[in-house]
């Protein structure tokens, strides 16, 4: 399937797709024009100017959608599909396994898509407390969280291309830091005295029933 470094790069790119689906693909297209990375012939389409423009628009749309607290769990569920597909493409592009037999193509799909899905699941567990803060306090918190996820995806995917081992450690580090912060935020939640929904302790109103606290 490829060297150890290319496999590590593939996992890093797929992990980045789990944070934001289209960021790693856009970076793959961009790095294709540098001395640091070259897409295989079957993946050269990713570096097409038209495709990169479309990917750029999709990145912006994904950030905007994730910035809307009202979409919440619906967006989290729907996002599995594009992230699994993006993880598969990124993994296969890094290893070049689509040029091989169907078995290796299937392995790329399982590993790449599975990695992206796993990272997205972790992201969802971390994001829930942030979403409660965004709904209870200010919409800007949701926007900041979404932009932060795009930044993490960019950092992980870029390091996956330039220094693959760093990407693996970065994924673990971001996950641990995120879980720690989300646990801290979860501990600051309280029940709404009117409807019983979970709200941030400093909230002035309940996002579920709209009553003042």
Functional labels for PLM-detected ranges:
Residues 60-73, 124-131:
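C-terminal ends of transmembrane helices
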Residues 192-195, 206-209:
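Short cysteine-rich clusters marking metal-coordination/redox-active sites
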Residues 1-5, 31-50, 90-108, 159-168:
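Helix-coil boundary and interhelical linker segments in multi-pass alpha-helical membrane proteins
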Residues 199, 212-213:
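Cys/His-rich microdomains that often coordinate metals
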Residues 80-92, 138-155, 201-202:
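Small-residue-rich segments of transmembrane alpha-helices in multi-pass membrane proteins
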Residues 73-85, 106:
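Cytoplasmic-side transmembrane-helix entry/capping segments in multi-pass membrane proteins
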Residues 55-65, 112-120, 176-180:
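Alpha-helical transmembrane segments of multi-pass membrane proteins
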Residues 85-97, 105-125:
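Mid-bilayer segments of alpha-helical transmembrane spans in multi-pass integral membrane proteins
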């Amino acid at each position: 399937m490829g060297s150890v470094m290319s496999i590590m790069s593939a996992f890093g790119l797929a992990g980045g797709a789990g944070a934001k689906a289209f960021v790693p693909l856009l970076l793959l297209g961009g790095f294709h024009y540098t001395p640091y990375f070259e897409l295989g012939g079957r993946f050269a389409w990713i570096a097409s100017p038209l495709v990169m423009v479309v990917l750029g628009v999709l990145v912006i749309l994904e950030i905007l959608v994730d910035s809307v607290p009202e979409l919440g769990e619906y967006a989290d569920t729907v996002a599995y599909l594009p992230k699994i597909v993006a993880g598969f493409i990124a993994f296969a592009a890094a290893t070049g396994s689509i040029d091989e037999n169907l078995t290796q193509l299937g392995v790329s799909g399982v590993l790449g898509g599975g990695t992206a899905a796993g990272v997205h699941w972790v992201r969802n567990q971390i994001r829930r407390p942030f979403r409660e803060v965004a709904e209870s306090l200010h919409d800007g918190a949701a926007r900041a969280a979404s932009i932060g996820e795009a930044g993490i995806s960019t950092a992980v995917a870029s390091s996956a291309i330039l220094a693959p081992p760093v990407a693996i450690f970065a994924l673990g580090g971001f996950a641990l830091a995120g879980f720690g912060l989300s646990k801290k935020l979860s501990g600051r939640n309280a029940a709404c005295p009117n409807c019983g929904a979970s709200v941030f302790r400093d909230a002035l109103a309940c996002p579920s029933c709209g009553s003042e606290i």
